[in-house]
Regions:
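Retroelement reverse transcriptase polymerase core
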Residues: 1-199
Length: 199
């Protein structure tokens, strides 16, 4: 509520239930009753998930394509420097048109609420988000940045050109109010992990 992402609303036509699922963390090793070491995934809390299956079934599907990962990785290969940027709370940066907000209504023990910003779980959210990011960076994609959802990989043939390209991408973020998660960003690195692949 305080962040302006949701607001209280009385019951509407579309009301979806909420489920809490474990938020997976890293891996640890735990001894079992036979004193054997067993790899175990740690739980770092719980994530609220809204079951939008009924709304999704009634929604017209958006087939905007996601970029081909292999083509992106090919364009990223063999550059001396990279800046790997991460969008902050990805989908929540996309506002929902006021006429459509009530469709995102969900109910939980604290009341009934609707989203002002695009939540996870909507069938068209990935396509909508990628379309928005592609629009924002359209003239820079494949020249100095690769964009996959909220992961932005800036590159250049030299340190100075990568730094210049980073400046252009950050300026575009500022112009469009796109917020980055600085804790997950890596600047001027010679290698890194992009979409699970080492570059």
């Amino acid at each position: 509520l305080d962040a302006g992402v949701i607001y209280p609303i009385s019951d509407r036509t579309w009301v979806s239930p909420v489920h809490c699922v474990p938020k997976k963390g890293g891996m640890t090793v735990v001894k079992n009753e036979k004193d054997e070491l067993i790899p175990t995934r740690t739980i770092t809390g719980h994530r609220m998930c809204i079951d939008y299956r009924k709304l999704n079934a009634a929604s017209r599907k958006d087939h905007f394509p996601l970029p081909f990962i292999d083509q992106m990785l090919e364009r990223l290969a063999n550059h001396p420097y990279y800046c790997l940027l991460d969008g902050y709370s990805g989908f929540f940066q996309i506002p929902i048109h006021p006429n459509d907000q009530e469709k995102t209504t969900f109910t939980c023990p604290y009341g009934t609420f609707a989203y002002k910003r695009m939540p996870f779980g909507l069938c068209n959210a990935p396509a909508t988000f990628q379309r928005c990011m592609t629009s924002i960076f359209s003239d820079l994609i494949e020249e100095m940045v690769e964009v996959f959802m909220d992961d932005f990989s800036v590159y250049g043939p030299s340190f100075s050109s990568c730094l210049l390209n980073l400046g252009r991408v950050l300026t575009r973020c500022e112009e469009t109010n796109l917020v980055l998660n600085w804790e997950k960003c890596h600047f001027m690195v010679k290698e890194g992990i992009v979409l699970g692949h080492k570059i």
